[in-house]
């Protein structure tokens, strides 16, 4: 199928949007994301929250987000916004960059999916199922899952190369051929499956909460005058707020990653089409804009948590208070 003619004005506009987005928008996004990850890590490592298995997943999630920001968004800012790309001059840097980006791009949603499964366990009406939500299981899942994905993406350290596209124009990417086809389909499957699993787990947790609502009210009312009852209410409140924070993360991820999923579907559908240079340039611009959109969920978690969780706001206020920072009693 032949390409549809595209005007030079359209290409110029798209390139300008892409350039200014990464020159000014992405550094701002990185700054916001850095603050978000730091505050999240400070809050979730506080004594009141770190004993909860879901908080352990959130800690891993924010560590992955922080590394992704400085491996992917920083590299995109320099290469797209300022035409600075060290990875096209050194093969080791090229391979390390691709490996880090692909690894932490999957680890962040993976940790969110683990947290979603933990919320399914803790909101189950079955007491034995709820008991499976433990810190030991959280550490085990994080360690095994991280090792699995680290080994799975080892191909990026082996089958990536620097390709010359034109005179003085180089690209650090996966080797053309079977490996590139594999990576293309993997990216599509990864995005669609991550999105689907998050939505399914989120809806499942909501269903569990609704089905347990009446039972929890009866239990809390019957023990409200005892110390144990107060602890049950406190723990239940923390679990609910962690659930709300998780659901907000899922909504944000789904909203901004959906655009990139659509682009990947389009890319696979049109991979055999004959495309002229102008259309390739347009698609490259769209891809970079979609990558910017897909990077937003890695940078906004803290601000969503501040909106939906009273406990998070309280702990954040304590953690960043001047008395605490200056170690004043």
Where are these predicted regions, by residue range?
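Loop architecture of class A 7-transmembrane GPCRs
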Residues: 2-13, 81-104, 130-138, 149-199, ...
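Intracellular effector-coupling site of seven-transmembrane GPCRs
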Residues: 207-260
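Extracellular TM2-ECL1-early TM3 structural module of rhodopsin-like
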Residues: 15-28, 54-116, 120-125, 130
């Amino acid at each position: 199928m032949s390409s549809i003619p595209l005007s030079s004005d359209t290409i110029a506009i798209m390139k300008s949007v892409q350039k200014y987005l990464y020159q000014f928008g992405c550094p701002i996004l990185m700054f916001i994301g850095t603050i978000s990850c730091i505050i999240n890590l400070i809050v979730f490592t506080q004594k009141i929250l770190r004993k909860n298995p879901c908080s352990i997943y959130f800690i891993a999630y924010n560590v992955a987000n922080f590394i992704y920001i400085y491996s992917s968004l920083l590299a995109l800012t320099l290469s797209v916004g300022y035409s600075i790309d060290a990875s096209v001059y050194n093969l080791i840097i090229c391979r390390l960059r691709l490996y880090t980006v692909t690894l932490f791009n999957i680890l962040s949603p993976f940790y969110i999916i683990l947290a979603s499964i933990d919320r399914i366990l803790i909101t189950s009406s079955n007491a034995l199922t709820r008991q499976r939500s433990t810190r030991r299981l959280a550490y085990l899942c994080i360690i095994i899952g991280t090792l699995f994905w680290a080994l799975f993406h080892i191909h990026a350290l082996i089958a990536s190369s620097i390709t010359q596209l034109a005179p003085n124009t180089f690209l650090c990417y996966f080797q053309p051929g079977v490996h590139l086809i594999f990576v293309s389909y993997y990216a599509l499957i990864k995005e669609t499956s991550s999105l689907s699993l998050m939505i399914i787990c989120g809806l499942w947790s909501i269903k569990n909460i609704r089905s347990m609502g009446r039972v929890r009210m009866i239990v809390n009312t019957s023990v409200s005058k005892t110390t144990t009852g107060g602890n049950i209410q406190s723990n239940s409140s923390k679990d609910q707020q962690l659930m709300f924070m998780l659901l907000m993360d899922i909504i944000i991820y789904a909203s901004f990653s959906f655009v990139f999923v659509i682009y990947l579907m389009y890319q696979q559908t049109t991979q055999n089409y004959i495309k002229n240079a102008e259309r390739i340039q347009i698609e490259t611009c769209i891809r970079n804009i979609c990558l910017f959109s897909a990077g937003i969920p890695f940078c906004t978690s803290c601000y969503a948590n501040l909106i939906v969780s009273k406990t998070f706001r309280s702990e954040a206020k304590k953690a960043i208070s001047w008395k605490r920072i200056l170690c004043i009693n």
